[in-house]
Amino acid sequence: MITTRTARQCGQADYGWLQARYTFSFGHYFDPKLLGYASLRVLNQEVLAPGAAFQPRTYPKVDILNVILDGEAEYRDSEGNHVQASAGEALLLSTQPGVSYSEHNLSKDKPLTRMQLWLDACPQRENPLIQKLALNMGKQQLIASPEGAMGSLQLRQQVWLHHIVLDKGESANFQLHGPRAYLQSIHGKFHALTHHEEKAALTCGDGAFIRDEANITLVADSPLRALLIDLPV
């Protein structure tokens, strides 16, 4: 079963220095029916104004994945670690109790645009605090997984995350690990097909809940960039 969640249905925020779209309840936006999906707690697309920053804050024990779409960001923690990431890169922060984290748009004249996901982390697992990965913009890529398969970022949860780039008319099929997945369009138009012959059309910024499907096929109706989050847990 596929249930779409259009970009217009998502929560919105505009603070001047920050513009955001929230898939699930976050900040001032609250919907008791949308507190996350399986281990996916947050899926935001945010634009930080030139020079803007998120001040240091602590997090619950989650893995925070930032996919940089445009611009360059710097991340720092209270332990003295810092790293920069730019467009075409994904950065994973394995947050720790009592450690605060900040984010800063390094450019003085260009906005920073990125997707941010929070995934519940298994309390027994300890991974590298910061991991970074270059995205392959020419094909499908597994960018995060429980064991760091195929050079992907290593998560503290049973989740597989795919970065998908397709030209118009191309298709891609994915075998899912369990009963749940979430599909997020970054840009482009496409349709998703299930083995039950169910079809859903998505466009830029739309998402879709996938339930009780063994596999999913994406067919690009225009040049496409998307994320598929395989969420058995």
Curated annotation (Swiss-Prot):
Its main location: cytoplasm. It is found in: Cytoplasm. InterPro entries: Pirin (IPR012093), Pirin_N_dom (IPR003829), Quercetinase_C (IPR041602), RmlC-like_jellyroll (IPR014710), RmlC_Cupin_sf (IPR011051). Keywords: Cytoplasm. GO terms for cellular component: cytoplasm. Pfam families: Pirin, Pirin_C_2. CDD domains: cupin_Yhhw_C. Does not have quercetin 2,3-dioxygenase activity. Monomer. Contains Cys residues that are easily oxidized. Belongs to the pirin family. PANTHER family: PIRIN-LIKE PROTEIN YHAK, QUERCETIN 2,3-DIOXYGENASE. This is Pirin-like protein YhaK. It comes from Escherichia coli (strain K12). The lineage of its organism: Bacteria, Pseudomonadati, Pseudomonadota, Gammaproteobacteria, Enterobacterales. The gene is yhaK.
